């Protein structure tokens, strides 16, 4: 199939309701981390703010954050990062009447007439996904060279040899530009490389190994002994796996900790807000985001990913967002964000990544 990005059509600012709209009002924050009353909360869509008669687009957006006017630009900032005196956009309307316009239909898309009552409107095990797979393959081929592909992984990948190998090939093939996960993904991947097990089970035969329940703890302990993951890989002569290939091909990875973690591994963020900052740093330039088998990290990533990206040349393009999970709830939770770019695929993620790697010729 022939793939092309959806064309973005900006608002027509000559329309009377936009041309005659007032400038947006800004008010300073009274204290660090506190927005003024009637602050405007951002959505996932392109949003424009009228300043001195000119409509400015918020270039790096994030839902449920506020718009700050700074150095002639609209900067989207989390509440916790606000500083006293920051100028915050005020207004709860989105139709331009307060100098704020949310442009929800900027990307061209063929829309068919939909009936009020129809079967299978959500995504389930009965949904046909062939078209979704083919579109995803084309997106990955495009963004390998013309975008940034960010993957968000749960530990399920590390429990299967073929899935682990397939994702390693994806990294080597240039289809992974950043990886976000938790302590478990990295721990069990390194366990697989070090001891050929995940949670004490052989990653191919799935047979429990003697005292295998120690294996992930031994792996963490050994990494901590060496002081870092790169040192562990070198000293223990590790030559396979997801984390190994991230290091080999200089793919950045963010490991966000949780309250149930063992260890953790040295690079894991123990502070949730530092982890969130590091994740958003990767999302700021992402053009395709694929989340698999981790509801917590998927929802967190979805909340910080807008539906669009402003590229270096000033063009606005769509961000493609996929949620792949065997749980229908997890998939439909992301679809409920209301984004035309959020797509769900209900399947076993181990099979999914193997199928995807083969389709890409890896």
Q: Which residues make up each language-model segment?
A:
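Gly/Ser/Thr-rich loops at beta-strand to alpha-helix junctions
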Residues: 94-95, 153-161, 184-187, 261-262, ...
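C-terminal functional extensions of proteins
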Residues: 203, 209-251, 261-289, 294-362
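Glycine-rich phosphate/diphosphate-binding loops that line cofactor/substrate pockets in enzymes
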Residues: 134-149, 170, 245-246, 281-286
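Long terminal accessory regions outside catalytic cores
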Residues: 1-83
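Gly-rich Lys/Arg/Thr-decorated short loops/hinges at beta-loop-alpha junctions or inter-strand turns
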Residues: 109-124, 221-225
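Short acidic, glycine/serine/threonine-rich loops at helix termini
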Residues: 100-104, 161-166, 189-195, 265-268, ...
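Loop/turn positions that initiate beta-strands
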Residues: 83-91
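Metabolite-binding pocket within alpha/beta catalytic cores that recognizes anionic/polar moieties
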Residues: 31, 139-141, 145-228, 346, ...
